[in-house]
């Protein structure tokens, strides 16, 4: 599609900003107590000058002091290039292999959905409440999610699918120039395969197209065949992949 993966990564980092983050010798350390690992992990994207082992030690101390596991998000843009191997030597294991996929906003697909499901455009607080209800999130994760979205510098468009007044699926989109990113796609187990997620993606793509965002990206675990099947309908293809590394007892 001719889309620069580095630009997608930049837009994704912009959308997942948190009030609790700092730079350390070119690494972006995010320290949110929320559910999203992208907002509570080390993102090593910039040049580095300090000895690598000492930097990792410092990260472990900082995350430990914050009551968080030390997670490293390893992308094709990670620096130094031997970081992944260095973490493996220290006993860090790789997990949550994630596909970053991209499609054009014109890739619409009107699908059939349960007639009892209705889509609603909602504000940030209502959206976060719906996500928390669908995930069964504890209050600390719900509050961190609200903090992150409420203070985002990017415009957000959120949709909740409801049946009998209850949320059954949701998804939101953040805008960054010619890019729009889809996040927080969640569907209640009893409603999977009934068209709710497809309808939300279709509506989000329509909104992106109307707003002039030509390219839409999302991130999905490679072991989620149901979600991959939905995204495939809209022509999403993988631009690059990333994974996390953590101690075996902290892979969460």
What spans do the regions from the language model cover?
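Conserved acetyl-CoA-binding loop-helix of GNAT-fold acetyltransferases
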Residues: 52-60, 184-189, 193-210, 229-233
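Conserved beta-strand-loop-alpha-helix junction that forms the acyl-donor binding cleft
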Residues: 74-81, 218-228, 245-251
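Short amphipathic alpha-helix that is part of the acyltransferase structural core
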Residues: 1-7, 98-100, 107-145, 162, ...
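Acyl-donor-binding surface of acyltransferase catalytic domains
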Residues: 50-125, 245-246
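A conserved beta-strand-loop-helix scaffold within acyl/acetyltransferase catalytic domains
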Residues: 144-186
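Conserved beta-hairpin
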Residues: 21-25, 76, 82-93, 155-171
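N-terminal charged segments
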Residues: 1-65, 79, 140
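Conserved GNAT acetyl-CoA-binding A-motif
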Residues: 66-76, 208-219
């Amino acid at each position: 599609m001719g889309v620069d993966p580095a630009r997608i990564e930049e837009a994704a980092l912009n959308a997942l900003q948190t009030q609790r983050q700092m730079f350390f010798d070119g690494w972006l350390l995010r320290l949110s107590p929320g559910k999203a690992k992208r907002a509570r992990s080390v993102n090593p994207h910039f040049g580095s000058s300090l000895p690598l082992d000492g930097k990792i030690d410092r990260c472990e101390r900082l995350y430990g002091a914050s009551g968080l596991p030390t997670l490293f998000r390893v992308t094709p843009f990670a620096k130094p290039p031997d970081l992944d191997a260095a973490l493996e030597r220290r006993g860090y294991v790789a997990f949550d292999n994630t596909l970053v996929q991209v499609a054009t906003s014109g890739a619409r697909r009107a699908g059939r959905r349960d007639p009892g499901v209705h889509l609603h455009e909602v504000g940030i607080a209502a959206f976060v409440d719906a996500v928390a209800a669908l995930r069964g999130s504890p209050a600390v994760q719900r509050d961190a999610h609200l903090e992150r979205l409420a203070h985002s510098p990017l415009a957000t468009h959120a949709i909740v699918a409801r049946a009998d007044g209850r949320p059954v699926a949701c998804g939101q989109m953040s805008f960054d120039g010619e890019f729009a990113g889809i996040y927080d796609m969640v569907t209640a187990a009893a409603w999977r395969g009934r068209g709710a997620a497809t309808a939300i993606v279709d509506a989000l793509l329509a909104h992106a197209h109307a707003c002039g965002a030509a390219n839409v990206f999302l991130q999905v675990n490679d072991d989620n065949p149901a979600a991959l099947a939905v995204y495939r309908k809209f022509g999403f293809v993988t631009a690059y992949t990333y994974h996390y590394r953590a101690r075996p007892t902290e892979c969460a």
